[in-house]
Structures are given as C-alpha cells and as structure tokens.
Amino acid sequence: MSVKSYIESNKDRFLEELFSLIRIPSISAKHENKPDMLTCAQRWTEVLLSSGADKAEVMPTKGNPVVYAEKMVSPNAPTVLVYAHYDVMPAEPLELWKSEPFEPVIRDGRIWARGADDDKGQGMIQVKGFETAIKEGLLQCNVKFIFEGEEEIGCLLYTSPSPRD
C-alpha cells in the first residue's frame, strides 16, 4: 500500500480521532475546564499508543499535564522531537459561531471547530504522519512527542525543568 492509499483508506478513522479531541473543551485559561485538560491529555495518550508509540503517559506538572510518548526504533538512530499543545482559547463570543465551537462540522471542505487548526489538528497531522510512516515501513528514526496544555496561557511549563531528557 502506498502512503497516499493508506491515508485515504484511514481518513474516516483519522477524522473521528481528531473530532474526539476537538469535542473536549480543553480551555487552559478557564479554571472550570481543569478536568477537561486531564481528559484531553489522557485521550492524546490513547491516540498516540494506537498510532504506534511504544509508550505514552500523562505527566503531572504544577499546571496542566504534559503528554509524553515515544517510539524507539534503534538506540543508534537519530531522534526527532514532535511538539504540540492540546489547550485551546475560549470560544466566546459564542454568538459569532455558525455551529457549536466544540462540535466539529465539515463545511466547504474545512473543519470548523475550536482547536481544529490550533493545535489539535496540527498535532493530529503529526501523529498520523508518524503512524503512516510506521505502517508503510518508512520510519527510520526514534520519535518523541511532547504535547503540553499551557501554550495558550504562556507556556508556564517551561519555567520548570524539562520533564524528559
């Protein structure tokens, strides 16, 4: 199977996995969404494991949790670090939305929802590229993922030491 045909044959699954993340209102700026931050981090670990990571974990921090995952192909291979964030901005003012902000809608060939682009969509593109590389036998490097939940409020995590070397 080619890369293009793998992606095409799995497109619906890829979209549903993305939509499951978008439906979680992981708004880092709102204290009432704190439980959603953990839920979203846990969902990312599930997606990463099902996509081919050898391990994935939610790491507690002083703020919102960090998702760490890795796929090690060889101790001698180079390592690529993939960064994304799972937190989103508040959706207000709600009256400006044509649809519910946390219920993804495909309109005119585009996904409309809070987090569809910044940054859950981008994170999913990276993860599904990783999955496709594994399935097609193309992955020749180690891959580590760091997904954090404080980018939208100033990356407070980075005032602390890195959670992993």
Where on the chain are the PLM-derived regions?
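N-terminal helical capping/dimerization or prosegment-like subdomains
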Residues: 1-94
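Short, flexible, glycine/charge-rich loop motifs used to bind or transfer phosphoryl groups or to couple energy/partner
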Residues: 58, 70-71, 101, 133-136, ...
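Active-site metal-coordination/substrate-binding segment of hydrolases
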Residues: 77-147
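Active-site-proximal loop/turn and secondary-structure-junction residues that shape catalytic pockets
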Residues: 151
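Conserved small/polar residues in nucleotide/adenosyl-binding loops
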Residues: 158-165
